[in-house]
């Protein structure tokens, strides 16, 4: 195991990479389709129909390329989450196992965003071009995206993202406190095993609620929706624990205000 002076910069570098990738993901999934849709979308006359698109190489080739990028991301994200790979990584990288997983996931997502091929001439599932819908629908989508991202960031109040990002493992190791998950209750471990992507509904809103749902966006939304659906397995016990944790943390946040009131 590397000394602490090397562990801390490695964990911080992984976190910074993941944070930057998250900012880029906001631009990729929200800002580009909402604010750049006029310049990037093709005219209705230039678009192919659904049947004609299946025979057009200029549409099929970029779609296959985009599908390959998504499968690369999903494959990396799933393979490195298996117990066999995690045990192997823990054996050779120790407490950096989670940080390495986060860094590899961020790099895979960067590949998807950097090399994604738009399909402006492809068919669209829906589109708003006539007034008043061309004004109000993009505005409504923008508001829903802002709310969704705020909810995603607010989940930091409930979930231990320092552990999910790999920072807490290194911090505890340096202080000699052991494994962070070993200190959590069985109910917390049960919840984390069922839900490692605690932003499912919000991400689905971001993926699907857009003014123009073109072919490549439809591919992105469908595949990530399927992946998110398979990655979740919450039950009533998890929901009760999650509700109790939210109430407890909100109570802790309100304590200073109560003290000032007294």
From Swiss-Prot:
Organism field: Bos taurus
Record bears the keyword Membrane: yes
Keyword Amino-acid biosynthesis attached: no
Name of the protein in question: Nurim
Localization per record: Nucleus inner membrane
Residue intervals passing through the bilayer: 5-28, 59-80, 98-114, 134-164, 192-210, 217-234
GO CC term (a single one): nuclear envelope
Keywords of this entry: Membrane, Nucleus, Transmembrane, Transmembrane helix
InterPro entries linked to this entry: Nurim-like
């Amino acid at each position: 195991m590397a000394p602490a002076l090397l562990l801390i910069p490695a964990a911080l570098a992984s976190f910074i990479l993941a944070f930057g990738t998250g900012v880029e993901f906001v631009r990729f999934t929200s800002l580009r389709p909402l604010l750049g849709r006029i310049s990037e979308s093709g005219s209705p006359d230039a678009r192919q129909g659904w049947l004609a698109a299946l025979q057009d190489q200029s549409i099929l080739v970029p779609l296959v390329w985009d599908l390959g990028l998504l499968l690369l991301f999903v494959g990396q994200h799933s393979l490195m989450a298996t117990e066999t790979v995690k045990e192997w990584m823990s054996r050779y990288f120790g407490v950096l196992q989670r940080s390495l997983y986060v860094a590899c996931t961020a790099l895979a997502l960067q590949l998807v965003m950097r090399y994604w091929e738009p399909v402006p001439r492809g068919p669209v599932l829906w589109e708003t071009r006539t007034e008043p819908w061309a004004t109000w629908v993009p505005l409504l989508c923008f508001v829903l995206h802002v709310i969704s991202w705020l909810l995603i960031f607010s989940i930091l109040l409930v979930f231990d993202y320092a552990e999910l990002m790999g920072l807490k493992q290194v911090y505890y190791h340096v202080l000699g406190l052991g494994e962070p998950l070993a200190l959590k209750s069985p109910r917390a471990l049960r919840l984390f095993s069922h839900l490692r992507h605690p932003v499912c509904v919000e991400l689905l809103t971001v993926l699907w609620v857009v003014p123009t749902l073109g072919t490549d966006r439809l591919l992105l939304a469908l595949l990530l929706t399927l992946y998110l659906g398979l990655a979740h397995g919450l039950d009533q016990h998890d929901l009760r624990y999650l509700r109790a944790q939210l109430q407890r943390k909100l109570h802790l946040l309100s304590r200073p205000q109560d003290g000032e009131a007294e």
